[in-house]
Regions:
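Extreme N-terminal starter segment of soluble prokaryotic enzymes
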Residues: 1-3
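Short amphipathic alpha-helix segments
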Residues: 5-25
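Short, intrinsically disordered low-complexity segments
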Residues: 25-75
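Short, aromatic/basic amphipathic alpha-helical patches
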Residues: 17-24, 51-55, 79-83
Length: 89
């Protein structure tokens, strides 16, 4: 699986609902970012994740999906632990 950053460019609630629905199906795993956006563990491409969340066709909300190849910065410990536990999983 790969780690992605999903950034809503409008309302985040429709994307959150899509993430929760797919998490219950075991398709994705995710955690919220402190202000806006989500870090997502998914076994497909950026386009496939965008399609799954309804971003591509606009059926949920608009947003940007970015694959993460490395990470660094300052964030809550729980976020770093979440990423580390899923990196290369």
């Amino acid at each position: 699986m790969a780690i992605f950053l999903v950034l809503p460019t409008d309302q985040s609630d429709p994307i959150l609902r899509a993430l929760k629905d797919n998490q219950s199906l075991g398709t994705v795993d995710f955690t919220d970012l402190p202000k806006n956006g989500f870090v997502v563990n998914f076994s497909g491409t950026t386009q496939e994740l965008s399609n799954l969340l309804g971003i591509t066709d606009g059926s949920s909300a608009s947003g940007v999906v970015v694959a993460i190849s490395s990470y660094y910065g300052r964030a809550p410990t729980t976020l770093w632990e979440w990423i580390k536990s899923r990196w290369n999983s």
